[in-house]
Amino acid sequence: MTIQEELEAVKQQFSCDLSLVHSSKDLFDLKVKYLGKKGIFRGFADQLRECPVEQKATIGASINACKQYIEEVLLEKSQVILAKEEAEEFLKEKVDVSLPGEDAPLGGKHIIKKVLDDVVDIFVRFGFCVREAPNIESEKNNFSLLNFEEDHPARQMQDTFYLDPVTVLRTHTSNVQSRELARNKPPVRVVAPGECFRNEDISARSHVTFHQVEAFHVDRDVSFSDLTSMLSGFYHIFFGRKVELRYRHSYFPFVEPGIEVDISCECRGAGCSLCKHSGWLEVAGAGMIHPNVLRQANIDPEEYSGYALGMGIERLAMLKYGISDIRLFSENDLRFLRQFS
């Protein structure tokens, strides 16, 4: 059999093989069979080398023509198979829009976010403006401008996270006070929500991160009675009931006098584990803004006065909803969180 006859037989065999191709894999296998390194046309290349010189051009042209024919047919077949497989894939992914849909699960506010918003909303109703400051703060804004002495324990690394010798993670939202008083002249009435950080052991009552709201008011003739009236009104609205407040003298560098605020426990003095059988629950620290803080902001303490108060949001949430462990707020336990969403 001559090479020409062999090429014709290859064409016929190729046509038979092509009729059995139904997928991309079948097509790939067929291509390897005829055009691969060990395929049928490899044998023709070997035969061509043994042909007489005067016949090589003619026979070589015939081999190339047959090979080109097979390549063109394979290309056409690949386009047909690709279109077919894409259509099949489309049908697999097709969505029946007539079927009833499935409701996506809805999220809800985290309890801390909910309580934080409730607290801020109450102060906004009282005429306060919302202001924020960065979590990463200079030691100056976090301590110095708020009348913290250089050797105050709060400045030490065992209590505060230092990023470098003069930069800290803020320990309170009072850094808003130092910024706002330096930027705005009285009257100033601001509520400042945010996240705070302290180097403490994590327990049922404390955490290294917590949320705080600070509120402060500076104007002429602001008095201690304005502070107590504000506190009384706030807690009455927040807890939805009349609560008795108790004020205890305390020390905070940025206020003078300073007080700690307690509210009456729901046990009404009978004593329970929540109030440690005292009948009272600590809820805030407050006081009249220290004259040194006003002077640092170039505000004359002889002309202006003001009060400041700060409260922990986790503490308020625990009291309002009867939660005994602060760690529950950050453990992402949906069984706990869904009770409040």
Curated annotation (Swiss-Prot):
GO cellular component: cytoplasm
MF-aspect GO terms: ATP binding; magnesium ion binding; phenylalanine-tRNA ligase activity; tRNA binding
Chief localisation class: cytoplasm
Enzyme Commission designation: 6.1.1.20
Cofactors named for this entry: Mg(2+)
Protein localization: Cytoplasm
Keywords linked to the UniProt accession: Aminoacyl-tRNA synthetase, ATP-binding, Cytoplasm, Ligase, Magnesium, Metal-binding, Nucleotide-binding, Protein biosynthesis
Gene Ontology BP annotations: phenylalanyl-tRNA aminoacylation
InterPro entries in the record: aa-tRNA-synth_II (IPR006195), aa-tRNA-synth_II/BPL/LPL (IPR045864), Phe-tRNA-synth_IIc_asu (IPR004529), Phe-tRNA_ligase_II_N (IPR004188), Phe_tRNA_ligase_alpha1_bac (IPR022911), Phenylalanyl-tRNA_Synthase (IPR002319), tRNA-bd_arm (IPR010978)
UniProt keyword annotation of Glycoprotein present: no
UniProt keyword Chloroplast, yes or no: no
Residues that hold Mg(2+) according to the record: 256
Assembly and binders: Tetramer of two alpha and two beta subunits.
NCBIfam families (UniProt xref): pheS
Name the record gives this protein: Phenylalanine--tRNA ligase alpha subunit
Organism taxonomic ancestry: Bacteria, Pseudomonadati, Chlamydiota, Chlamydiia, Chlamydiales
